[in-house]
């Protein structure tokens, strides 16, 4: 709680007034924003749904980690629960605008992100593409995951999290922190502002080896911007 209070005090010094949105029921997630017309949706231990200006659905997530055992299937089930909750809000508000953002704790190519039963977040999607696909007679809405564009070593950093384990399968760099958006949000996204943050006003966020500095955070933060 001390860290949250310190962050809150630092945010108060920003030029823009930021409000701590209501995430009661989701102690793992805290959200600040400059929008006042914000109504909380479903609050769960692992996600917080917020309705902004009665037309934008934003869901902050902090999903199951693999540090204490693999939880691939559990994350798929949680992603399915999140999308089910969002679907009902979309129907009620008659909107298609959705942003899912946060620590998904798996990379874009893994089950919860790509599975049609999960986020169904594809690496390529255009505004004119068909917005869904049918699997065994059931229709699944497509989402878009722009984080694929930041993956790999063409530009530092290669991901948001670094971990080496004695396993045959270990990419070392992982893109655990992501933003996933609905098809309707694609033209509103400012592509140049999708970034992995490695520096802040107080200095760099990485070690001498250029890995995330766990004394600050074991994950690099991300940022994105939308014209709304």
Where are these regions (language model features)?
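Structured beta-strand-rich core segments of catalytic domains in phosphoester-bond hydrolases
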Residues: 1-66
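Extracytoplasmic/secreted cell-surface and envelope-processing proteins
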Residues: 7, 67-70, 108-111
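Glycine-rich, phosphate-binding/catalytic loops in enzymes
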Residues: 10-13, 76-77, 116-120
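Loop/turn elements at helix/coil->beta-strand transitions in domains of secreted/extracellular proteins
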Residues: 54-56, 94-97
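Catalytic metal-binding/acid-base residues of hydrolase active sites
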Residues: 62-64, 104-107
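A long, amphipathic alpha-helix that forms part
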Residues: 69-94
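Metal-dependent phosphoester-hydrolase catalytic domains
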Residues: 91-93, 106-228
């Amino acid at each position: 709680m001390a860290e949250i209070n310190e962050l809150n005090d630092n945010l108060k010094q920003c030029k823009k007034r930021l409000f701590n949105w209501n995430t009661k029921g989701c102690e793992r997630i805290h959200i600040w924003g400059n929008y006042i017309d914000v109504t909380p949706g479903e609050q769960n231990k692992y996600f917080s749904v917020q309705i902004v200006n009665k037309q934008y659905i934003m869901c902050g997530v902090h999903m199951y980690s693999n540090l204490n055992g693999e939880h691939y299937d559990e994350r798929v089930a949680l992603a399915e629960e999140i999308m089910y909750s969002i679907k009902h809000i979309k129907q009620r508000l008659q909107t298609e605008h959705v942003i899912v953002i946060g620590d998904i704790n798996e990379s874009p190519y893994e089950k919860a992100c790509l599975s049609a039963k999960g986020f169904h977040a594809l690496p390529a999607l255009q505004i004119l593409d068909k917005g869904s696909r049918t699997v065994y007679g059931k229709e699944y809405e497509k989402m878009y995951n722009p984080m694929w564009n930041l993956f790999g070593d063409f530009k530092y950093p290669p991901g948001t999290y670094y971990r080496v384990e004695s396993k045959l399968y270990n990419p070392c760099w992982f893109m655990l922190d992501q933003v996933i958006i609905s098809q309707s949000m694609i033209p509103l996204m400012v592509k140049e502002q999708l970034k992995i943050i490695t520096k802040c006003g107080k200095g760099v966020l990485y070690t001498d080896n250029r890995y995330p500095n766990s004394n600050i955070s074991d994950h690099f933060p991300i940022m994105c911007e939308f014209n709304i």
